[in-house]
From Swiss-Prot:
InterPro entries xrefs: Acyl_CoA_acyltransferase, Bact_Acetyltransf, GNAT_dom
Name by which UniProt lists this protein: Uncharacterized N-acetyltransferase Mb2688
Family per record: Belongs to the acetyltransferase family.
E.C. designation(s): 2.3.1.-
Keywords: Acyltransferase, Transferase
Top-rank taxon: Bacteria
A single MF term (Gene Ontology): acyltransferase activity, transferring groups other than amino-acyl groups
Stretches assigned to the N-acetyltransferase domain: 10-156
């Protein structure tokens, strides 16, 4: 199994956990197929504007984060997901440490992310790691428009 295959398998299990309960399973599946497939991860892994960082256990990918360089000195933390069995183990904090170090190595001034306004667990984690709410945005998922908070962490 390639890293792209493993990442797609983890994404298929973890992305639905971050979605509000009202989102229809077919909309989640459609998003996963379009954006989190093995083929898409193969593209992401070769894209010089992206970095995919992994959390591993016994050599297997159990979580990942994806960073995207902007045209300015901002970096988007596009995704950060862990398999449920690894929540509360310190794996997310270790992955976030890699995220911030990579962004700093790229010369970023700040890292930003979007998190669903109903995902309080993720919001608490991001706040604990220094992110602050800086605005809102909408995220289309199927026929629905979900409301996200934009959270930012300054690096300098």
């Amino acid at each position: 199994m390639t890293d792209a295959d493993e990442l797609a398998a983890v994404a298929a299990r973890t992305f639905p956990l971050a979605c509000p309960p009202a989102v229809a399973p077919e909309h989640i599946a459609s998003f996963v197929d379009a954006n989190l497939s093995s083929a898409r991860f193969a593209e992401y892994l070769t894209d010089p504007r992206r970095a995919i960082l992994t959390a591993r256990h016994d050599g297997r990918i159990v979580g990942y984060a994806m960073l995207i360089r902007g045209d300015d000195r901002d970096v988007e933390l596009s995704k950060l997901y862990l398999l449920p069995g690894y929540h509360g183990t310190g794996a997310a904090a270790a992955l976030m440490h890699k995220v911030l170090a990579t962004a700093a190595d790229w010369g970023a001034l700040r890292v930003w992310l979007g998190v669903n306004q109903k995902n309080q667990r993720a919001q608490r984690f991001y706040a604990k790691t220094g992110f602050k709410i800086n605005g809102t945005r909408t995220f289309r998922l199927g026929a629905h428009h979900e409301n996200d908070y934009v959270m930012v962490r300054e690096l300098v």
